[in-house]
Amino acid sequence: MRFPAPMIKYIGSKRMLVPHISGIIRTLPDVQQVCDLFAGTTRIGQALKRCGLRVHSNDLATYSEVFGTTYIATNAESVDAERLRRLLAELMALPPVRGYFTETFCEESRYFQPFNGMKMDAIRAGIDMLATNETERAILLTSLIEAADRVDSTTGLQMAYLKGWSARSYNPLELRLPDLLPGSGAVTRMDANDLVRQLDAEIDLVYIDPPYNQHSYFSNYHIWETFVRNDAPPTYGIAKKREDCRTEKSAYNSKKQAGTVFADLLNAIRAPYLLVSFNSEGYFTRDEITAMLDGKGYVASVALDFKRYVGAQIGIFNPSGEKVGSISHLRNHEHLFLVGPDRSRVEAAIGATQERAQTKQIALCGD
């Protein structure tokens, strides 16, 4: 069995949903091409690519486009892995430089140890000098982001950092070649509601995992956005967020607008199958989402119980050691909704998912 490669800490990664989503897809033999509209780190897209599907990865975040280029669009069999290893070795050999990343994220805040920040500054500048095309650039940037994530001092969100240095933050930054996958796919950076009106008619299933409350992934992971853009933006607050985090908001993050924009998205989709995941902390209830999907075909759903992300369990602290906010609950539900033209297939797929959840079985491609 081949498990997904390790990835960055990401509150929206759906790591625990991967086996359930893979299992659902495997019960639908007529599904060959899938679009992931809100791809994030591309964890779901990677799992589906491993299933032999052609995947179209989309997200508005620039860092997601980099992950999509690396893991979804790139065919591992067409890449010169030895050249990439040489480039990574050259980047690791660069002398440290005290630049924007060190000053902003290591000295003015404490996301990373300064000795690692100086390596990041040097490597980020080196990537733009050494990469000869967008694929190489994306792979090298992915390696840098994943390396930085392994030595950070957060609970997985970049809204704050730990009151004391994490143990991993003392480890030296180490670039590794990303675990590329065979096969090609597509990647876009577009508004999801615009993209669905342009999607290839051959897309068989659209996976929808929209932002579900007021928290923006753009601001939750502002450091990765800055790593990719390399634009040294002005920042604000203890978290040193990009200034444009104040204005870069999705309609899905607004309680007043989310219902309208989500309904518009669903109405515009023409694929025969829809697979929607939604968190119980979101704006919509299970019944409300079922009603929205009802006109698209037969609908079945399952609720899966999971622990909340680690920051919600231990709390987040500011530089003075004071806890920011309070812990309200430790568990929530991820709802999976499948919509399709055949009632028996839809119900069988969701029924099998419910059984796997109850027996703690997993279904990953390659087993």
Stretches found by the model and what they are:
Residues 285-288, 292-362:
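C-terminal catalytic and target-recognition region of SAM-dependent MTase-like enzymes
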Residues 63, 68-122:
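Conserved phosphoryl-transfer catalytic core
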Residues 1-38, 43-51, 65-67, 74, ...:
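S-adenosyl-L-methionine
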Residues 21, 34-48, 57-62, 201-220, ...:
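Conserved proline-anchored active-site loop of SAM-dependent methyltransferases
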Residues 216-223, 257-262:
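A short, conserved alpha-helix within the catalytic core of class I
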Residues 249-296, 300:
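Conserved Class I SAM-dependent methyltransferase catalytic core
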Residues 2-3, 39, 97-98, 102-220, ...:
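SAM-dependent nucleic-acid methyltransferase catalytic core
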